[in-house]
């Protein structure tokens, strides 16, 4: 088993040492968490600039950290990790495998890349940007499939419909934007 023990940190500068650079945000830490777990790791370590330093008032933080670590525990990414945990605990762990063959056609590059994991009767596909995806529903049991969107930032579930086996295009109605991340959930009907 593997774990990503040090991915990016929420609110740390992209270039690490230049505090004037853009900072990694909640959608960035979610991306690394979902990519890691859907690729087959047994877990993920959340990181936050202020929390990792246990930054206290009156102390100058490294990497541009400004807020006390207790306050950083209210940052969005910190509180959004529970939605990944809840999703993964909903489905059997020991039969789940990473399976990119569920993604038909071109998968995309860099942040546009979708990642899939499945069990015998369910399929989960994480999409960071909301781009259209061609998904092969024949890899899990059943001739009819039920599908939902799961919103990574708040855990909301939205029923999409029932589909026959085959390849279908899915795109979340909120459009194609970086950080517009959702999980397509498909189960045997």
PLM ranges: what are they?
Residues 10-12, 25-161, 173-189:
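Aromatic- and carboxylate-lined catalytic core of secreted/periplasmic carbohydrate-active enzymes
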């Amino acid at each position: 088993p593997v774990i990503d023990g040090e991915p990016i940190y929420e609110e740390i500068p992209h270039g690490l040492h230049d505090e004037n650079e853009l900072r990694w945000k909640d959608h960035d830490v979610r991306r690394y968490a979902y990519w890691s777990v859907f690729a087959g790791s047994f877990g993920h370590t959340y990181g936050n600039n202020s929390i990792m330093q246990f930054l206290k008032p009156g102390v100058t933080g490294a990497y541009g950290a400004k807020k006390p670590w207790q306050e950083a525990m209210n940052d969005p990414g910190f509180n959004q990790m529970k939605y990944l945990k809840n999703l993964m605990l909903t489905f059997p762990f020991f039969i789940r495998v990473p399976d990119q063959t569920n993604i038909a056609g071109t998968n995309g590059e860099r942040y546009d890349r979708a990642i899939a994991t499945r069990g015998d009767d369910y399929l989960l596909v994480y999409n960071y940007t909301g781009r259209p995806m061609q998904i092969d529903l024949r890899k899990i049991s059943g001739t009819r499939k039920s599908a939902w969107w799961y919103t990574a930032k708040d855990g909301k579930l939205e029923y999409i419909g029932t589909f026959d086996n085959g390849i279908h295009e899915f795109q979340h109605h909120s459009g194609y934007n970086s950080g517009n991340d959702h999980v397509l959930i498909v189960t045997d009907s």
